[in-house]
Amino acid sequence: SRKIVITKKIMEVRKSQDGISGIKVLLHIKNKSSFAFTKLNITDYLPKLVAPSKEFGTIRPTTVQRSPSGAIRVIWDIPRLERGEERIISYNIRSRLSIIGRFTLPGATVEYRNKKGRLIRVHSNRLTLLIPEEKRE
């Protein structure tokens, strides 16, 4: 069984006339084991059509990296997660262009070391939005 689980949810979708202008994303990390973990690394990946806004909800990221292809990695370091503890990371992303049609947000990952020191990587779900085109009269 997984000791640490991560789920990705969309809390809010802000629409403009041309499609989606912003999305509020929530990452839910839970320690289901009977012991604490230290030095967790959470990475969320954003496609090149979107970028994180400057406002971060609960926990500010340690770093935001842009790859040469334009995709973005948002990274949070969590020093310690106690047994049974849950962390909620929320942040807003804005789109550079209005998004219409199918839009997929890749899954996030949590990396941590187990008691034996082995690196464990857990992936969250991916999210797909279907944005209908607005009918214009």
Question: Predicted segment positions?
Answer:
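Short beta-strand elements of extracellular/lumenal beta-sandwich folds
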Residues: 10-12, 16-38
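Extracellular/luminal low-complexity Ser/Thr/Pro-rich, glycosylation-prone repeat/linker regions
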Residues: 1-10, 106-137
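Residue-level recognition of well-ordered beta-strand positions that form the cores
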Residues: 9, 26-30, 43-45, 77, ...
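Short solvent-exposed strand-capping/beta-turn motif centered on an Asx-Ser/Thr pair
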Residues: 30-36, 45-49, 96-98
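Extended acidic, low-complexity intrinsically disordered regions
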Residues: 1-2, 10-17, 68-70
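Hydrophobic core residues within well-ordered beta-strands of beta-rich domains
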Residues: 4, 23-25, 87, 103-104
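Low-complexity, intrinsically disordered segments enriched in Ser/Thr together with acidic residues
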Residues: 77-107, 112-117
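A surface/secretory-pathway sequence property marking extracellular, secreted
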Residues: 38-83, 120, 125-127, 132
